[in-house]
Amino acid sequence: MEPKLLLSAHKPLFVSCNSPFNEKTKLSVKSGLPMSTIRAARSQFMGEGLILGNKYGFWSTSRKTRVVVEPVRAAVKRRKELTFDSVVQRDKKLKLVLNIRKILVSQPDRMMSLRGLGKYRRDLGLKKRRRFIALLRKYPGVFEIVEEGAYSLRFKMTSEAERLYLDEMRIRNELEDVLVVKLRKLVMMSIDKRILLEKISHLKTDLGLPLEFRDTICQRYPQYFRVVPTPRGPALELTHWDPELAVSAAELSEDDNRTRESEERNLIIDRPPKFNRVKLPRGLNLSKSETRKISQFRDMQYISPYKDFSHLRSGTLEKEKHACGVIHELLSLTTEKRTLVDHLTHFREEFRFSQQLRGMLIRHPDLFYVSLKGERDSVFLREAYRNSELIDKDPLTLVKEKMRALVSVPRFPRRGGPRKDEEGREVEIDGSDADGEEEEEESDAEEWSDVDGYLEGEDGGNDDDGDWTDDEGEEDVPPNFDDDDEDEEEDSVKIGLSPSSRKSSSPRKKEEKVLTPVFPDGTPREKW
């Protein structure tokens, strides 16, 4: 068939015959494997697709149908709270001091040279070429520099810091039973009742474990747990399940709250309130839909972190409810009821956490707070804090607060601050305690009385009111703008004087500045 060309003025040029280029492409797949094509539903990506649906084919056993589960989404905006951020900020210096102390106590006599400390510059996170002697002198309450020879400088802990360190070691030995319970509860929450020691070491400081817990606590109690080798390293495995320990802190607090509320209200009929209010942080304004989602999530049935959760599917509300319960219980085991978000991500395999763990924590502002202060994000258990202070403080936390007080001791104390006696106790200088120092301070008080009166804004408390009325007429005289530089210097010196002294010197000054009127040629001018 020969092609015919049709020309038209209002239509473009086209071929009238059926060209093979205009036909739809047909794909044929030929293979030795038996397969059948089934008409599938229209997809949003590929349109109408083909599904290999032979029930008894080669791929039937290896290819399973996957059910798409949408992740739980609750777009809650994070609000910055200074009460929690200040907790992270005030521990910034303390963290550096504790790291230096950890290096120092590893020495035989707890004394180290500054040259030896320079080898740990990278471990301490010090990037700049900073002199260690200047760094240690910033904390005179913790470290003391000792000179041995002309070019040998060594440092050690002060007597107060040494005493605090010994108290901390004593408290850790007394709380060893509590630390064993924390390890048992941590392993009991895992899915396989086994956790790698390398992962537990990330939480050793937060849980209050000693540095050598692998060789001490993990080896002393084989009736509770044991260390087993694994292809990924040694792991702590549970050997005895205690049902009495399988009670979370949330369940205990719920029972206590219910008992206390029933006693306070003295209700005749025990019934839930008609309207359940969601307690949110101050300043966090959420929409009605977001508040409703948080309320519905809170009213869901509580899933204990110690129950078997292998049947829970990831991405469901039930799995997120269980994950929040695990994190709540894990934070309640820590000494300060907070930890780093990165530490929690190490336990994704043991607790089946989602990949968006930080987002899950932000979605529940009524339970947790995520602080972005510092190099790494921190998560707080909200109910354990009142403003920026812990409600129930661990003995190790009390020791840490004393250490923080030593870190904040300034190198040069301010004048007028509290003084310390020989035993290191603060002494307030009262009238009865400072009898011997009154004579030494009398001269200073006389010299600085005018300056203090000017700074405090006093109106001449010891002066009579009549002294101010004698010079009222002189204040109405306009100022003289023809002063010399020497007069300006005298005025600048007398700025710090009290009003009474400045008033007494003004008549003498004006007598010296009396000028006679003259003509331009210098002849005196008559007064009228």
Curated annotation (Swiss-Prot):
Q: Name one Pfam family in it.
A: PORR
Read off the lineage from the record. Eukaryota, Viridiplantae, Streptophyta, Embryophyta, Tracheophyta
GO BP field = Group II intron splicing; mRNA processing; photosynthesis
Q: Which UniProt keywords apply?
A: Chloroplast, mRNA processing, mRNA splicing, Plastid, RNA-binding, Transit peptide
* Protein's organism: Arabidopsis thaliana (Mouse-ear cress)
UniProt keyword annotation of RNA-binding present: yes
Which GO CC terms are listed, alphabetically? chloroplast
Q: Which PANTHER family match?
A: PROTEIN WHAT'S THIS FACTOR 1 HOMOLOG, CHLOROPLASTIC
For this entry, the protein name equals Protein WHAT'S THIS FACTOR 1 homolog, chloroplastic
Q: Where is the PORR domain?
A: 80-408
